């Protein structure tokens, strides 16, 4: 989340089982307290279904079935869905698209746009080793993201192909 915010995302609202995470919410662990300080500046409260209304993007790293078609329908026009729970995503691509999603990505290899760490780690770590770096900083992560994005040409870019497949040549 910190990296996404550093790249310009503005209105980020994180949720957990109890709903929106915001500064001052009772019962937050130290990590969630830290995230509450840099996200949800309007201190929106409520369930995922309540705070997702009007959202452009959903990034899920939680549990199967967390996002419903009704929730997708309440999002902004042509929302982008990253449903990365594995092996069963927060919502399946066909369901998300039927509800109006423009782009859908999952952590599964049997659907287009698989988000898989195999796209990043070999090259990122090769660069870290070659540079004899002692840590992986945000600049390196951003460079890796741009390098991966650059593997899909403008001619190839479609809603079904925003990320290269792990086994693309």
Language-model region placement:
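Short glycine/serine/threonine-rich phosphate/pyrophosphate-binding segments
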Residues: 1-2, 22-23, 65-70, 89-91, ...
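Predominant activation on well-ordered alpha-helical scaffold segments within soluble catalytic domains
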Residues: 1-2, 36, 49, 56, ...
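Secondary-structure transition/capping motifs at alpha-helix termini
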Residues: 4-12, 75-78, 98-104
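Hydrophobic alpha-helical scaffolding
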Residues: 3, 38-48, 57, 61-65, ...
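Generic beta-strand/beta-sheet core signal
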Residues: 7, 15-17, 60-62, 75, ...
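Adenosine-phosphate binding glycine-rich loop
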Residues: 83-169
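Glycine-rich phosphate/diphosphate-binding loop of Rossmann-like nucleotide-binding domains
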Residues: 1-59, 63
């Amino acid at each position: 989340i910190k990296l996404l915010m550093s790249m310009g995302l503005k209105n980020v609202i994180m949720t957990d089982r109890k709903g929106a995470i915001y500064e001052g919410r009772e019962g937050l662990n130290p990590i969630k307290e830290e995230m509450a300080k840099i996200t949800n500046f309007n201190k929106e409260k409520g369930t995922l279904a309540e705070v997702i209304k009007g959202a452009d993007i959903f990034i899920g790293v939680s549990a199967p079935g967390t996002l419903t078609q009704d929730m997708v329908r309440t999002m902004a026009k042509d929302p982008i869905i990253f449903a990365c729970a594995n092996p069963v995503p927060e919502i399946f691509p066909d369901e998300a698209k039927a509800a109006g999603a423009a782009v859908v990505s999952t952590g599964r290899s049997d659907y287009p746009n698989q988000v898989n760490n195999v796209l990043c780690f070999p090259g990122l770590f090769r660069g870290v080793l070659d540079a004899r770096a002692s840590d992986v900083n945000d600049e390196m992560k951003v460079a890796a993201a741009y390098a991966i994005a650059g593997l899909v040409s403008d001619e190839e870019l479609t809603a079904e192909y925003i990320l290269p497949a792990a086994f693309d040549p």
